Amino acid sequence: MNSSKTSLDAKITDITKKLEALNKEYADSVKKSDELSKLLSKENDNSPASQEAAARHILELKDDLENELENAKLDDISAPTAEQSKKISEIYGKYIEKISKINDASLTSDSLAWKYAIKYDWEIAKGHHDNQLRLLNPTFFYGNASVYPMNAFSNQYGKYGQLPYKQLLANFKEAVQHKIVMSKVYSKMVVNAFVGRLFQEELTKFVEDKSKNEISVADLIESSSLEGNWKEFLKYYATTYYNAATHGLGEDIKELKLYKENKTNEKELSIDARDKGGKIVKLYGLGLTEKDLNQRNVGLGFAEGDATVNGQSMYRQILKMATTSDLTDDQVNNIGYETTKKSAENSKKIANQAADLIVGKGKKWEAKIKYDADGIGPEEIKEETVVIRDEKGNIDIPSFTKWLNDEEFFFGREGSAYWTDTIKNGLKTDPNLKKYVGELTKFDYDQLLTKGNKDAKHGSITNEEFYYGGLSAFKAYEQFKKTTQNYGRKFFANEVPDYDIQTYKFNEREFVGVGAYNSGIKKFMFNVDPYFSLPKWSVTSFANHESMMGHHNQLMYAQKYLSSVGEFGKYKLGNVFHYTSYVEGWALFMEWFGIEAGFYGTPDYDNKDGDLYAMPVDFSTAHGITNFFTAKTEAEVTDDMIQQIKDLHNGVYWNKVAQVNKYENQDKKHAMDAVKLANLLQYQGALNEAQLRNMRLALDTAYHGKGVKGHEDLPAGASINQVREFMKKNSSLGIGDITSESRRYLSYVGQATSYNSGKAVMMDLYTKVQKKLGLTRREFVEKDNHKYVKEFFDALLRNSALPMDALIKSVSAKYGLTVEKK
């Protein structure tokens, strides 16, 4: 009896607790409803309590959406079905309507950023599913802001290996039915990439099999130990999917095969395999031929599609995600084209300054150079004489571009005479480079030094020169870090952890471009291959973009110093946004700020045109890679200063400035002029990198935008070769950079358009805030220990990588700027 009573009492107690919990939940919901009604009313105040309630409601809506997706088992789907995409779109649509009702009057500058960034993120996600991007098997696993078609550029194959292969395969089969198939040129590059990355063991077996001179890609995949469904997916892609293309056919091979001889006369992207002894062996069949390089209409926008979906609508969705704007493909193309043409004139001013340094004020500049017209291609280096400035003072930009691409301006391509045993041993035994020697070993570059490989040709140099050129590039980027990092930190209110430097795996280097920043390991990555790396005069702008103050600073800031709302930081959104237009826009913004901060010389803050990229007024001293040189007169030049400029970047500036004036017994004068040339050319690198991003807007859309009208020198549906020709004529980029970048824009659909989109917004905000504060440009940078620029940078950084509209609203609210209505 007592036992039964005890059991009954326990049940009553339990029921009572549940009723109390339900009553509390009801009371809370009534309170939340009252707060919500107040938030949505136009009469609500902007009190701290109201601000907290609004911030909480934004976060609750975000949580509610995520919970609804999770409960429907739709929260972590990287290969959705048609039905799943439809349901996901409906859920996003419902919550977009809810968050839109929150009244901005209750929001702080931070919660305003949260509201509009979340809303935009949901709109982008809905657009991905409404436009059936699932048929491209894109990178859903990277989040709404980074959904790009399966491609040859980003190293995603390990990630794909963890996905549901059956659904990936089903999506591609459905894509074939809808005629949403990437071009043969595009798809062959994808096959090339995954064969080179996933099947090295099988390639070695093929190399060693003397009875075979060819093998089909399907048979190569079949011979591997990959899991069965993964195997079937890759085989389908390399056979049925590849052959279903109706545009951009190029060589139009019916069965993709690998050959031991170059039967298809391919020009580039031959696969590097190895025999059992480690010797590099070229395999052919998956590289690019002349037909591939000249093929028009190879981009996504030209995928035929049907009544329900087409490549053009898919590209426009990706473009909206990348630029965080509603600009059409034709509008983006025109912006890129016009800014490219306008900026090309800047090089003339730099060429004149360089001419004055090297040959004298106003004199004719004729230079002998060693020039490799096709980079990694079969053509040999040629000695040429170029007239950069004639007797009348006219500058010839193509000749100046050739001079800037002289072999000596590339690490590893200085010529065999440079690579003495003393130089090589000095690099190998330098204690500051010990860890980088280890990096080269770890990523499989030691094979370049083996007896059978070291004297073999790599382009126009040897494999050994390739290796030591890579090691000397490590030295240069380490020197950049040591000379600029502490100065760069002065412009930020919060300090971030240090970064390190790394390269890529040997068998990935042809696909990865010149470099990137890896936030997971806090490392600035660069390509050590002398034919896929940037010239020496781009070291500052490139390294600043990727490291301190660029990507590294922004991404580490997002991990440590994000905003909050309420007392004691009660409400925090966290690091949830990763929009490329912001991430790359910030890095480009910092490239520009290097000019404003004096990395290249004394900034021209007072130029009459208001040109933010204006040439520094004096290149004698700088805060960048030559900040070891503080001398204003020859008497102040020390032996250590002379030695450092002699060694900088393998002596290229010391050598180039002495083309005419040999500086006999004038080492101090020689050093001063070499430093000026180094700073001048690093500034040229900054302008050239800015020009590269101008071109990216035009080139990505020229490849993929079916709605683009085009231009005489850059037509719509441009071929790879047409893109390269445009880059040659409108920049100082090296042939290796042009080669890798032109492949990248075709492969990484839409991504290249993100860079300038974000930078333009940030530079516009910079100028508006400076003027709103009533400060000159110099005061904005320098006054009160950089106080004002620190506060502005914090306003940009404190809410992670926002869509541009949200960033504009947030910064404008903080500084009282007027937001222009769309």
Short names for language-model regions:
Residues 3-822:
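N-terminal maturation segment of proteins
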